[in-house]
Amino acid sequence: MSKVLTSLPAGERVGIAFSGGLDTSVAVAWMREKGAVPCTYTADIGQYDEPDIDSVPGRAGAYGAELARLVDCRAALVEEGLAALTTGAFHIRSAGRSYFNTTPLGRAVTGTLLVRAMLEDDVQIWGDGSTYKGNDIERFYRYGLLANPSLRIYKPWLDAGFVAELGGRKEMSEWLQARDLPYRASTEKAYSTDANIWGATHEAKRLEHLDVGVELVEPIMGVRFWDPEVEIAPEDVSIGFEQGRPVSINGATFESAVDLVLEANAIGGRHGLGMSDQIENRIIEAKSRGIYEAPGMALLHAAYERLVNAIHNEDTVASYHNEGRRLGRLMYEGRWLDPQALMLRESLQRWVGNAVTGTVTLRLRRGEDYSILDTQGPAFSYHPDKLSMERTEDSAFGPVDRIGQLTMRNLDIADSRAKLEQYAGMGMVGSSQVSLIGALESGGAEAIASRGESSGDELLDRAAMESGTD
């Protein structure tokens, strides 16, 4: 049975995720006029595009909300973001820059905590401003039902009656003015913005066109680092981690993780760190484009991955990247709380994050231009003396050891040569490969694998094989 209502449930209480903007203000007033009982819930997620979040619930009453609540989600959102940082749950990357999944993180938190707040008020119907073409409609649907299995969904923008009457911003503003309802006129931007404490997303409108670049965006968490008239002085910053968790910035600790993230945002923001321009696949497989800000996450991520590389071996680092990308995709799809995501998340936090303790010092300049000045920690796998070209005492291995190691490689090199000879005989190896290694005449593999030793050695080898010794 469908959980989605396609028409207004008159006479029933409907919870609306209320931002105080034009869309949700009109939705509340329209539902009240048509006979529903709107109840508004505003999430405080540290959004940088709303400087006066405390005043938002008060505005809802003017539009007919029966009750209006502000739900503080900042601490929960910061914790989920730190989990994403520890697990590397970021799958969208382009030319070395990552999108840190800041919007999907926000949806996981608001999609559950707002519905739980509604449950406290016995509100069983939920609506929000997501549209049918985007990702959020599915994310909110999944998280809402996880938090309240009896939840029903009503979205004004899926109601043909609402869309027919109030199909655009012009119609919405005129509708409010005709009823003498307050309307905060705002300058029409060339793009839309959605933000929380971890980052900001800019998309749609002019940004849908790929002949428009990042310069169109006015950053809300940082500076226009591409503008030469913006002065940005170099700055050194040290980030301390304990068991995969950032605990200090420049040696200072903080009363809460929220305060630490705010400080990281301030430092990264004044250098324009963490802005990226991405083309991505939405959940419905259509491609979209977004320009993202995440100055604090980018700063913490740079320091964290430096420590990951210093502490863990190659296979562990590879698993961290591979499983982190899978986890990032699950989060993007609204599956951050699904069992398959929890399995990946717990494993990465336990076996990768828990070992990450240390301090990294970076010198920030403009945008992504930074240097790592120092990396310190108590349990590194990095030991420069192991590979030093200088003479060292008690070396881990010597020249003779390396000769033996290279000799053991003859087996797989011979296998590769044999396959190349086979492919050459089948006409599969082209001129580009031949130009590198020459003509592939038969017999090369045997020459590589041959030891060239005495007949006595051959007798020993034969005896070992016949006796089954491996």
From Swiss-Prot:
EC annotation from Swiss-Prot or TrEMBL: 6.3.4.5
Catalytic activity, as annotated: L-citrulline + L-aspartate + ATP = 2-(N(omega)-L-arginino)succinate + AMP + diphosphate + H(+)
One record GO biological process: L-arginine biosynthetic process
Keyword field: Amino-acid biosynthesis, Arginine biosynthesis, ATP-binding, Cytoplasm, Ligase, Nucleotide-binding
Region (Disordered): 448-470
Protein's pathway: Amino-acid biosynthesis; L-arginine biosynthesis; L-arginine from L-ornithine and carbamoyl phosphate: step 2/3
Keyword set includes Amino-acid biosynthesis: yes
GO-annotated cellular components: cytoplasm
Binding site for L-aspartate: 131, 135-136
GO molecular function: argininosuccinate synthase activity; ATP binding; protein homodimerization activity
One matching Pfam family: Arginosuc_synth
Compartments, as annotated in UniProt: Cytoplasm
Chief place of localization: cytoplasm
Positions annotated to bind ATP: 17-25, 43, 129, 131, 136, 194
Gene3D superfamilies cross-referenced by the UniProt entry: 1.10.287.400, Argininosuccinate synthetase, chain A, domain 2 (3.90.1260.10), HUPs (3.40.50.620)
InterPro entries, per database record: Arg_succ_synth_type2_subfam, Arginosuc_syn_C, Arginosuc_syn_N, Arginosuc_synth, Arginosuc_synth_CS, Arginosuc_synth_type_1_subfam, AS_cat/multimer_dom_body, AS_multimer_C_tail
Statement: the UniProt record of this protein carries the keyword rRNA-binding: no
Chain residues that bind L-citrulline: 99, 135, 139, 192, 201, 203, 280
NCBIfam families: argG, PRK05370.1
Similarity annotation: Belongs to the argininosuccinate synthase family. Type 2 subfamily.
Quaternary data: Homotetramer.
Name the UniProt record assigns to this protein: Argininosuccinate synthase
Native species: Kineococcus radiotolerans (strain ATCC BAA-149 / DSM 14245 / SRS30216)
Lineage, uppermost ranks: Bacteria, Bacillati, Actinomycetota, Actinomycetes, Kineosporiales
